[in-house]
Swiss-Prot record:
Compositionally biased region (Basic and acidic residues): 358-381
Residues the entry annotates as binding DNA: K460, K461, Y518
Originating organism: Epstein-Barr virus (strain GD1)
Gene: EBNA1
Region of interest (Disordered), residue spans: 1-124, 168-478, 612-641
Ranges where the record places region Interaction with host C1QBP/P32: 325-376
Low complexity bias spans: 383-394
Hydrolase listed as a keyword: yes
Name recorded for this polypeptide: Epstein-Barr nuclear antigen 1
Domain remarks: The N-terminus contains the region UR1 that binds zinc and is essential for EBNA1 to activate transcription. This domain dimerizes upon coordinating. The Gly-Gly-Ala repeat region (GAr) inhibits the mRNA translation of EBNA1 in cis and thus prevents MHC-I restricted presentation of EBNA1 epitopes to the host cytotoxic T cells. The chromosome-tethering regions contain Gly-Arg (GR) repeats that function as AT hooks and are involved in EBNA1 stable replication and partition of episomes. The C-terminus DNA binding and dimerization domain (DBD/DD) is required for the viral latent DNA replication.
CC per GO annotation: host cell nucleus
Region of interest called DBD/DD, as start-end residue ranges on this chain: 452-607
Any one GO molecular function term: endonuclease activity
Modification sites for Phosphoserine: S385, S393
Principal location class: host cell
Length: 641
């Protein structure tokens, strides 16, 4: 069928002319059915499996390629599944002889899919033959509207296989899927970075191929995906050269359009095959440039063979991305906790357990708000894996079609704030729980949270605290806060208690955000056993700026506060300063916490507390008796102290 034939001729284009020519299809130099070009490209004629252009050397995908020599029936609309590649997406490209060239492996690359319908772009050539310098697979041409060229084939393993060309970016389509790995030849060049898809989804920037194991150059870091979803920049694995170790290229950050953040590639640790140079510390993962940026995962510093691993730079805070701070698990680039740049242990692993990348920008409020409005106890699923499916979150929102319009159903993001306590979208779940990683002790976590799941029903609706109101235990998170305070308090040793034990002084703490206050409150409780702290509550509104109407006296704002009762004024001052100093070093909501000292002329008579009986007989006692005591109603003035 002449080379030029439209390829619809009787032959199903499967290379029938050469089919038999040998399992590799090496036969077909020359004509080799041009038919292919429309194979998976939109027009469904299942013609040639292979996008070969007229003389494309291998007619890409020629020959039986299904090793059994059997031709498959002609119309094979899908490119998937055939054993042999037949080009649909050009997968089989290159089976044919390379022009006149090496048999078998060395097929030429399918010269990209024609600019025809959105077809599979030309397949990547399977790299040059193992000859001295097999050419690199040509870059897959970009399908005009179509899929992107699957990146250049891997360069042949020849003496210096060229690098696979970068995948062309699909003009409107998917992105080029990254350059092939450079051949393992003497000095395989680095695979070119995958081109970013121009529009549409961004290319996952190709990981730069690992440099050949020869004098390998480091793989160039994957290019950043262009706008669109951000491509995760591939981390170039440095070639383990005989000589210097390639420093892993830092993964390019996906330039987030509105994209998710590119996870900064972890810099590869230079391997240093012979312990050549020490691997330069892994480059820090590039920050995800924020669109609604996710947190760039701080690159794990590679352990160089001597050079200290570079610290993963914290993912840059995108607009709303989490990043902040260097790796490690603390407040570092590790888990984006979301909400404006405060990185952090959040839900944990790199960018991980917590926002599950989904919409990390307000990850906390969103995805989790959903989780909660959902009415099933599971605010963050305990196990990372469960998230996507079990949490039901994504799937479970849509089904009830337009529901959001009728009325704020818990799940609908729009109504987050109704559910979740205020425009800043923090769920009303215990703020403690909010950003805690899976808490270690149920001491306070939402009693219904994941950990409650086993307990049948919710024990009592959400208790921010575990056992009795307000007996929160300790756990690593609050311990850290407490530790910070203890250090600051250690600066001055002053009396914290008095003989009379009257609560005459106080520290009034407010502002920041509910969550930051809650955490600080739990921290103070651990650091200063001598104090007594009220639950978190809300401030009323103050004055309206203009002459207009003023708020009612009872009108609550969403700004929270709590009061710390103390027995000495001097310690109140010390504690105030400590809190101020602790808070100012922290990121956003926290640094806005304000503190002021109060003094109570006659002291506040806090109701007496009788420790519960040991046998547990009267374990309710502590509640019980202060109830009977009548105390709490009227501050228990009946002769407390």
């Amino acid at each position: 069928m002449s080379d030029e034939g439209p390829g619809t001729g009787p032959g199903n284009g499967l290379g029938q002319k050469e089919d038999s020519s040998g399992p590799e299809g090496s036969g077909g130099s020359g004509p080799q059915r041009r038919g292919g070009d429309n194979h998976g490209r939109g027009r469904g004629r299942g013609r040639g499996r292979g996008g070969g252009r007229p003389g494309a050397p291998g007619g890409s995908g020629s020959g039986p390629r299904h090793r059994d020599g059997v031709r498959r029936p002609q119309k094979r609309p899908s490119c998937i599944g055939c054993k042999g590649a037949h080009g649909g997406t050009g997968s089989g490209a290159g089976a044919g002889g390379a022009g006149a060239g090496g048999a078998g492996a060395g097929g030429g690359a399918g010269a990209g899919g024609g600019a025809g319908g959105a077809g599979g772009a030309g397949g990547a050539g399977a790299g040059g033959g193992a000859g001295a310098g097999g050419g690199a697979g040509g870059a897959g041409g970009a399908g005009a509207g179509g899929g992107a060229g699957a990146g250049g084939g891997a360069g042949g393993a020849g003496a210096g296989g060229g690098a696979g060309g970068a995948g062309g970016a699909g003009a409107g389509g998917g992105a080029g899927a990254g350059g092939g790995a450079g051949g393992a030849g003497a000095g395989g060049g680095a695979g070119g970075a995958g081109g970013a898809g121009a529009g549409g989804g961004a290319g996952a920037g190709g990981a730069g191929g690992a440099g050949g194991a020869g004098a390998g150059g480091a793989g160039a870091g994957g290019g950043a995906g262009g706008a669109g979803g951000a491509g995760a920049g591939g981390a170039g694995a440095g070639g383990a050269g005989a000589g210097g170790a390639g420093a892993g290229g830092a993964g390019g950050a996906g330039a987030g359009g509105a994209g998710g953040a590119g996870a900064g590639g972890a810099g590869g640790a230079g391997a240093g095959e012979e312990a050549g140079g020490a691997g330069a510390g892994g480059g820090a993962g590039g920050a995800g440039a924020g669109g609604a940026g996710g947190a760039g995962a701080g690159g794990a510093g590679g352990a160089g063979a001597g050079g200290a691993g570079g610290a993963g730079a914290g993912g840059g805070a995108g607009a709303g991305g989490a990043g902040a701070g260097g790796g490690g698990r603390g407040r570092g680039g590790s888990g984006g906790r979301g909400r404006g740049g405060s990185g952090g242990r959040g839900r944990g692993g790199s960018g991980g357990r917590r926002g599950r990348g989904r919409e990390r920008a307000r990850g906390r409020s969103r995805e989790r708000a959903r989780g909660r409005g959902r009415g099933r106890g599971e605010k963050r699923p305990r196990s990372p894996s469960s998230q996507s499916s079990s949490s039901g979150s994504p799937p479970r929102r849509p089904p009830p079609g337009r529901r959001p319009f009728f009325h704020p159903v818990g799940d609908a993001d729009y109504f987050e704030y109704l559910q979740e306590g205020g425009p800043d979208g923090e769920p009303d779940v215990p703020p403690g729980a909010i950003e805690q990683g899976p808490t270690d002790d149920p001491g306070e976590g939402p009693s219904t949270g994941p950990r409650g799941q086993g307990d049948g029903g919710r024990r009592k609706k959400g208790g921010w605290f575990g056992k009795h109101r307000g007996q929160g235990g300790s756990n690593p998170k609050f311990e850290n806060i407490a530790e910070g305070l203890r250090v600051l308090l250690a600066r001055s040793h002053v009396e914290r208690t008095t003989e009379e034990g009257n609560w005459v002084a106080g520290v009034f703490v407010y502002g920041g955000s509910k969550t930051s206050l809650y955490n600080l409150r739990r921290g103070i409780a651990l650091a200063v056993p001598q104090c007594r702290i009220t639950p978190l509550s809300r401030l009323p509104f103050g004055m309206a700026p203009g002459p207009g109407p003023q708020p009612g006296p009872l009108r609550e704002s969403i700004v929270c506060y709590f009061m710390v009762f103390l027995q000495t004024h001097i310690f109140a001052e010390v504690l105030k300063d400590a809190i101020k100093d602790l808070v100012m070093t922290k990121p956003a909501p926290t640094c806005n916490i304000k503190v002021t000292v109060c003094s109570f002329d006659d002291g506040v008579d806090l109701p007496p507390w009788f420790p519960p009986m040991v046998e547990g007989a009267a374990a309710e006692g502590d509640d019980g008796d202060d109830g009977d005591e009548g105390g709490d109603g009227d501050e228990g003035e009946e002769g407390q102290e």
